[in-house]
Each structure stands twice: as structure tokens, then as C-alpha cells.
Design a protein with these regions (language model features):
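Internal alpha-helical scaffold of NAD(P)-dependent oxidoreductase catalytic cores
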Residues: 12-99
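Short, conserved glycine- and acidic-residue-centered signature motifs
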Residues: 1, 79, 146
Length: 192
């Protein structure tokens, strides 16, 4: 259950309202806030948009590793490296004084990367278990937007040349049809 479904059953949720106009963001945040929805505001619209795409890519990576039976320790290292990779990309594409440990960045990445309700993690798990991209998409009957986000960020990064080994691995698996087992093994050498 991700944010939308949790809000429907009144589970505690946290939302960040991103807007270049702080007054408007505060107005919207006040209107959305409730006993079970906590809100905050940010002016980092582009950074939050990029991180929202990247978290889906990293959730696919986490799912692939899960499907390949990598353990919890490896998953933690993968996500730790994903946070660093996201920060490098954000600081290059949209330099701003931001803290990627804030819930809008890290929290969103963690829930999408670890939740069994995440479409992107589920898609990645299927790929890791040997499904083709097409067969995983058909069986899921939902859109794993990270599939498209991977290609989009890869194209943007051609102009910025940020070191993004996790993005590159996911791209190679999804679009170049490199074996997940081989590509993730290669990725392990670049993780710290």
C-alpha cells in the first residue's frame, strides 16, 4: 500500500508540496493536512520531480536483485548507493542546497524500493526471476513507470555525464537485453 491507498484507509502519511511560490505551497499544504496527513513544503520542484523518476528506477533495481535472490545486506548497500547516485545527479542537473535524506527524497525511495506493493519493485522482481520485459508488463496489468523513466534519465544523463552505475545497469537489462545475472554481478563491483 503506497501513499494513495494508505490515505484512503487513514494511515498516517506525509506529503511534500513542491512549488516555486512558498505562499501557494503553504496554502495547499494547510488544505491537505489532516489528523493523519502531515505536510511540508519545498521549492525544489525540479529536484523532487527528478527524484520521483529515479526512485522508480532504483526500485526496479532492488526488485531485480530480489528476483535474483540477493539478500537484505546487498539490498541495503544497493539503496545506499542509489541515494548517493541520486544526489550526484540532482546536484549536477539542478544544483540546490537540498538534503536528500529528507523524506521527500529518501523516504520516497525507501518505500518504493522496499514495498511489496510497489509496481516498480514488482516489475524488477519479475525481471530478476527471468521474465522478459514484455511478459512482465503484460502479466502485471499495471504500468511500472520506472521502465520509461530509466530511458528518460539515461537520455538526460548523456548531456551531463554523471556516474550512474545503477541507472546504467537497469538500462542495460531493460533496453539492451543484457542478462540481469551478468549485469548485477558487474554492478556489484562499483558499489561501495
Amino acid at each position: 500500500r503506497l501513499v494513495g491507498s494508505e490515505m484512503c484507509i487513514r494511515d498516517s502519511s506525509y506529503l511534500t508540496i513542491a512549488c516555486p511560490d512558498t505562499d501557494k505551497a503553504c496554502t495547499i499544504a494547510r488544505r491537505l493536512a489532516s489528523s493523519f496527513i502531515k505536510t511540508s513544503v519545498s521549492n525544489d520542484v525540479a529536484g523532487i520531480e527528478y527524484s520521483s523518476v529515479l526512485k522508480n528506477v532504483y526500485a526496479i533495481a532492488a526488485g531485480i536483485c530480489s528476483g535474483l535472490k540477493y539478500g537484505d545486506n546487498f539490498q541495503a548497500v544497493l539503496i545506499s548507493n542509489a541515494v548517493q547516485e541520486m544526489n550526484r545527479f540532482l546536484q549536477t542537473v539542478h544544483p540546490l542546497n537540498r538534503n536528500v535524506n529528507d523524506s521527500v527524497y529518501l523516504g520516497d525511495l525507501l518505500v518504493t524500493g522496499y514495498s511489496n506493493f510497489s509496481r516498480n519493485r514488482t516489475f524488477g522482481t519479475m525481471i530478476g526471476k527471468g521474465y522478459s520485459v514484455k511478459s512482465a508488463q503484460i502479466e502485471m496489468e499495471m504500468i511500472a513507470e520506472g521502465y520509461y523513466g530509466t530511458k528518460c534519465i539515461k537520455e538526460i544523463n548523456k548531456h551531463h555525464h554523471v556516474n550512474m552505475p545503477i541507472l546504467d545497469a537497469v538500462y542495460n537489462i531493460l533496453y539492451e537485453r543484457i542478462s540481469p545475472m551478468i549485469e548485477i554481478k558487474l554492478l556489484t563491483d562499483s558499489l561501495r
